[in-house]
Amino acid sequence: MIQQTLAIIKPDATKRHLIGEILSYMEKNGLAIKALKMLHLTKEQTEGFYAEHQGKDFFDPLVAFMISEPIVVAVLEGENAVENYRLLMGATKPEERKLGTIRKMFGLGYRENAVHGSDSETSAKREIAYFFTPSEIV
C-alpha cells in the first residue's frame, strides 16, 4: 500500500551538513520526496508538535534540542512508507542500531539521532498536516 510519512532531519544532522546525504539515502531506498522545507522551529511550534510528551522527563531537553538549529521536514511516499522509513531510520537506542540504518550511520547519541519518523499512519497524517498544507505536497 502506498503511504506517506513525515521525516525530520534533526538539528544534530543539519549542523553537520548531512541534509543532502540523508535525503539521497531516503530516495535510494525507495522513498520519494513529495514535500520539503527547512525551518528553524520556535519553542511554541516544538511544544505543539511534541504535545503528547508534555510532562515527561525528556520533554524540556527535547524541545531545547529541536530549537537549537534548523531542521528539515519532508513528506516521504512509498510502499508501506511508515514502516519502511522506520526500518531505514533504525533504533532510537544507540546500542540497538543496525548497519545500514540512518541512525547507525549519522546518529551521535540517544537524542542526537539525526532523524525522526512518524510511528503510525495516524501519526503520519497528523504530523504532515502540522508542517504542510495539501497544496505544498506534490
Swiss-Prot record:
The record's listing under SUPFAM superfamilies reads:
Nucleoside diphosphate kinase, NDK
Q: What is its EC number?
A: 2.7.4.6
Q: Does the keyword Magnesium apply?
A: yes
Task: Tell me where on the tree of life, at the top rank, the source sits.
Answer: Bacteria
What does the UniProt entry say about where the protein is found? Cytoplasm
Any Pfam family matching the protein: NDK
Keyword Cytoplasm in the entry? The reply is yes
Q: What class of enzyme is it?
A: transferase
| Keyword annotations | ATP-binding, Cytoplasm, Kinase, Magnesium, Metal-binding, Nucleotide metabolism, Nucleotide-binding, Phosphoprotein, Transferase
Report one GO cellular component. cytoplasm
Which residues of the sequence carry a binding annotation for ATP?
10, 58, 86, 92, 103, 113
Name any cofactors this protein relies on: Mg(2+)
A Gene Ontology biological process term: GTP biosynthetic process
Any GO molecular function: metal ion binding
**Active site: residue positions:** 116
Task: Spell out the InterPro entries in the cross-references.
Answer: NDK-like_dom, NDK-like_dom_sf, Nucleoside_diP_kinase, Nucleoside_diP_kinase_AS
Catalysis: reaction(s)? a 2'-deoxyribonucleoside 5'-diphosphate + ATP = a 2'-deoxyribonucleoside 5'-triphosphate + ADP; a ribonucleoside 5'-diphosphate + ATP = a ribonucleoside 5'-triphosphate + ADP
Query: What does this gene product do?
Result: Major role in the synthesis of nucleoside triphosphates other than ATP. The ATP gamma phosphate is transferred to the NDP beta phosphate via a ping-pong mechanism, using a phosphorylated active-site intermediate.
Quaternary data: Homotetramer.
Give the family per the record. Belongs to the NDK family.
* PANTHER family, alphabetized: NUCLEOSIDE DIPHOSPHATE KINASE, NUCLEOSIDE DIPHOSPHATE KINASE DDB_G0292928-RELATED
For this entry, the protein name equals Nucleoside diphosphate kinase
Q: Which organism is it from?
A: Glaesserella parasuis serovar 5 (strain SH0165)
* Lineage summary: Bacteria, Pseudomonadati, Pseudomonadota, Gammaproteobacteria, Pasteurellales
Tell me the name of the encoding gene. Answer: ndk
